[in-house]
Design a protein with these regions (language model features):
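Oxyanion-binding "anion nests"
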Residues: 156-201
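A short secondary-structure junction signal
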Residues: 46-48, 85-90, 150-152, 184-188, ...
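Active-site lining segments that contact anionic ligands and/or coordinate catalytic metals
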Residues: 170, 185-187, 194, 217-221, ...
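Residues in well-ordered beta-strands of folded domains
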Residues: 36, 77, 130, 140, ...
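Charged, compositionally biased interaction regions
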Residues: 33, 108-117, 125-129, 235-279
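Dual-mode signal for accessory low-complexity, basic/Gly-rich regions
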Residues: 183, 199-260
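Active-site bordering "gate/hinge" segments
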Residues: 1-170
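Short, glycine-/Ser/Thr-/acidic-enriched flexible segments
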Residues: 40-42, 81, 134, 144, ...
Length: 279
């Protein structure tokens, strides 16, 4: 199925909600395996649509993704194109270099490392992330399952991740650099209460989260990175969250990997720290 920008512009300029019902999306859950190849950022059409039509396009992409991930095998791979480099915010040659490095990894070793880490955490009801500046974030995991991304998920690969119990994440989380809406903020602390980001050490960051709908402020994911060929942070989340020795938390939607927080966005933030078992 082609998701070309020019075709999608024509479709969504006049599409109605009734065009994409459950029967339509149900077709995509019948495949055994799906390879989703990105030559450009899927939600960006390069063309202005009326707000209602753009909202329909976003909902379509979200619902399509939720169905595709139910297939037995689902992988997403980004081609090192100029369009994808532009999305990353990196110089095109630097983007290609970093992507090539992340792809050129020992996949068997990454899978073994991911499976070992997931086994260590399996069955834990609570974990803590300990960071610089004395910050500690505690997350409740009861009833939730660790998942691995080791070559058959999001490529470049290399992470394990879990959806914490949405209302039971508490504490402070520190980021040496927090990348947000194209800006880089240094030495940022986020305050999290009952699963929700409630404040920050930096006013601009606090204002950003305060302006979001509540569901987009909910901590929806924790994931340690496992790819040894990603060696430093660059602000491109797709790579940063895979870096071995880092962790990331995400806020917003997590229904696409079987959890409960339905939201319009999913944003990841990468830091350095240790994830440890509490119980």
């Amino acid at each position: 199925m082609q998701q070309a920008r020019s075709v999608n512009r024509e479709i969504f300029a006049g599409a109605k909600e009734s065009c994409f019902d459950e029967r339509y999306f149900g077709l995509f859950s019948k495949f055994d395996a799906v390879l989703d190849v990105f030559a450009c950022q899927p939600i960006v059409l390069g063309y202005e649509l009326e707000d209602a039509q753009m909202d329909l396009c976003r909902r379509y992409i979200s619902q399509l993704f939720e169905k595709l991930v139910t297939c037995r095998r689902f992988a997403q791979i980004r081609i090192p194109t100029a369009a994808n480099a532009a999305e990353s915010g990196l110089d095109p040659q630097e983007y290609i270099r970093r992507m090539d490095c992340a792809y050129d990894v020992d996949y068997a070793a990454v899978r073994a490392a991911c499976e070992h880490a997931a086994a260590q955490f399996a069955g834990a009801s609570r974990v803590a992330v300990r960071m610089g500046e004395g910050c500690v974030l505690q997350l409740e995991l009861t009833g939730r399952t660790w998942l691995t991304d080791a070559g058959d998920g999001d490529l470049p690969c290399g992470e394990i991740y879990i959806a914490p119990v949405e209302a039971k994440t508490n504490g402070d989380v520190f980021f040496g650099t927090l990348y947000l809406e194209g800006e880089a903020y240094t030495d940022v602390t986020l305050q999290i209460t009952n699963g929700e980001i409630t404040g920050s050490s930096q006013k601009a960051v606090a204002a950003h989260f305060a302006a979001l709908p509540r569901e987009n402020r909910i901590v929806c994911e924790l994931g340690p990175g496992m790819n040894p060929n990603v060696t430093d942070l660059c602000g491109y989340t797709l790579l940063d969250e895979k870096m071995a020795g880092t962790f990331h938390i995400a806020v917003g939607a997590n229904t696409m990997f079987g959890s409960e927080n339905r939201a319009t966005d999913h944003g990841d933030f990468v830091g350095r720290g240790e994830v440890e078992l509490l119980a």
